[in-house]
Regions:
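Leucine-rich repeat
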Residues: 2-231, 235-237, 412, ...
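A structural signal for leucine-rich repeat
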Residues: 124-129, 151-165, 182-190, 206-214, ...
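Alpha-helix capping/termination and helix-coil
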Residues: 325-331, 346-352, 356, 365-378, ...
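Conserved hydrophobic position(s) of the canonical leucine-rich repeat
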Residues: 52, 106, 135-137, 167, ...
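C-terminal structured "cap/appendage" subdomains that terminate the fold
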Residues: 416-452
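C-terminal helix/juxtamembrane-tail motif
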Residues: 2-4, 452-472
Length: 472
């Protein structure tokens, strides 16, 4: 017995003497239901849980299930037994860890879990605990679980999150969290906000992004319908005086609303970088946006019947891009006159899809007199092919008429354009015609790179004696 006690004492001493970093690494490798049990081995381990600055509580299956199931709701409306068991284990683990917490600050809380109706108050209490401990980074991924044809649980983000004076970085992805910010004093130190939404249920999208006085980076992604109720249209309002970088990636569920498209208004006087991606074009409005340097626009779904709508609303979207130096744009169709003048544009990436509206390239060349670098990339899109059906192969692929030469050579070709990259071309007649035109008229062109095999048709054509022609 004596030797056994002595051995246990030696083990306890060794555990107590382990460096903090090594303890952290050991615990990170253990399954959570075993990790918390380490508190019985040594006071040092218990103290570790009471003061560890970074807390990661992640249900391992959540990301995979969420990625597979785009509706975020189990198809059967039922839990798998192993998921339910793991979920309960996680609840106990998180509650146990936070119940041991001493007065030390929490630097980061990462909480990725499911949420049933009976879990709402518990999850909210964990968030409030993090706020009380001066959390700096908060990462929430909360997935509601509920039966088909039932209303899911609603978790209102605690008011203390909005008023937290230490929170700098906030990420939230949820199909059940709602946002009701106070009228003043919100997010006094928040610099980065990443919100992933699914079918916002109220007018919170008008409020959440307009109460961040020092916000510099904002990302809004997710799936939306056009309306939040039968009488209220969905609106996103971004008003942030210090915002420098904005990402909007929203996709529309056409099953949930057939009224006018949702709207997005942006007031950001210091905005420098904007990245926009939609499968339908919302109604955009901009105010005090005059500092853009870099922009990206991707309207990624094409329907022929949608062309007039896009052309009608595209000018409002593109108007603040007049000042950019770097632009990437991927659209299926824009009528002539939709583009502003790009007097400061130096680098352009133009993604052409299978509907091949080459007039857009012509207009860009004409409206970008100082363009120095051009990337043209063809991207296959089966939706275009399906929309055109048999006319696609007869009228699009094998016709030189898809490209119309400009009436006069654009200024950028004769004076500034030094680099051209062509990607994804298949060697169709209109593609060869475009490449030949650029090569023939690029008077100051230094390098043209073609990622394709139709090099034999271009080898002997150069408008600039200094141009290096490269095929890869």
């Amino acid at each position: 017995m004596g030797s056994t006690s002595k051995l246990q004492g030696m083990i306890t001493d060794r555990i107590s003497e382990l460096p903090h970093e090594l303890l952290s690494q050991i615990l990170s490798l253990l399954p959570r239901k075993y990790a918390f049990r380490t508190t019985i081995l040594s006071k040092r381990w218990k103290k570790y849980w009471a003061s560890v600055p970074e807390l990661d509580f992640v249900f391992e299956e959540l990301s995979a299930v969420w990625a597979i199931n785009t509706t975020l709701t189990p198809p059967t409306g039922m839990w798998k037994n192993e998921y339910l068991s793991d979920h309960v284990d996680l609840l106990r683990f998180v509650h146990g860890v936070l119940s041991l917490r001493d007065s030390s600050d929490i630097w980061r809380l990462r909480l990725h879990c499911y949420c049933r109706a009976q879990d709402v108050s518990l999850v909210a209490s964990w968030i409030r605990t993090a706020i009380r401990h001066n959390v700096v980074e908060l990462d929430l991924r909360i997935k509601a679980i509920y039966k088909v044809n039932e209303d899911g649980p609603i978790l209102e983000l605690p008011k203390c999150v909005f008023l937290c004076t230490t929170l700098v970085d906030f990420k939230v992805m949820s199909n059940c969290i709602t946002y009701a910010p106070p009228t003043s004093g919100c997010f006094p130190r928040l610099k980065s906000l990443d919100v992933k939404v699914e079918y916002p249920r109220d007018d919170s999208m008008e409020k959440l992004f307009s109460c961040c006085p020092v916000l510099q980076v904002l990302s809004i992604t997710g799936i939306v319908s056009d309306v939040v109720s039968q009488t209220i249209a969905l609106k996103f309002k971004v008003s942030a005086p210090e915002l420098k970088m904005l990402k909007m990636s929203l996709f529309r569920d056409y099953r949930k609303g057939d009224g006018p498209s949702y709207s997005i208004s942006i007031n950001a006087p210091k905005l420098e970088n904007i990245d926009i991606k939609h499968d339908s074009l919302p109604m955009y409005s901009f105010e005090n946006v005059h500092s853009l340097v870099r922009g990206s626009v991707d309207l990624c779904v094409h329907y022929g019947s949608y062309h007039n709508y896009v052309s009608e609303h595209a000018p409002a979207l593109l108007e603040p891009f007049y000042n950019v130096k770097h632009l990437s744009i991927a659209v299926h169709y824009l009528k002539e006159g939709c583009l502003p003048a790009f007097d400061k544009l130096r680098e352009l990436k133009l993604v052409i899809r299978d509907c091949y509206y080459w007039d857009l390239l012509t207009e860009f060349l004409n409206k970008s007199p100082n363009l120095e670098s051009l990337v043209i990339e063809h991207e296959d899109d089966q939706v275009c092919v399906d929309d055109y059906e048999e006319l696609y192969f007869e009228c699009v692929l094998h016709s030189e008429d898809q490209w119309r030469r400009p009436e006069s050579v654009p200024i950028c070709l004769t004076s500034h354009l030094e680099s051209i990259m062509i990607r994804g071309f298949k060697g169709y007649p209109h593609e060869v015609k475009v490449a030949r035109y650029l090569l023939d008229n690029g008077r100051v062109l230094k390098k043209m790179t073609v990622e394709n095999e139709f090099h034999k048709q271009l080898k002997q054509r150069k408008g600039s004696k200094d141009c290096e022609l490269e095929f890869v």
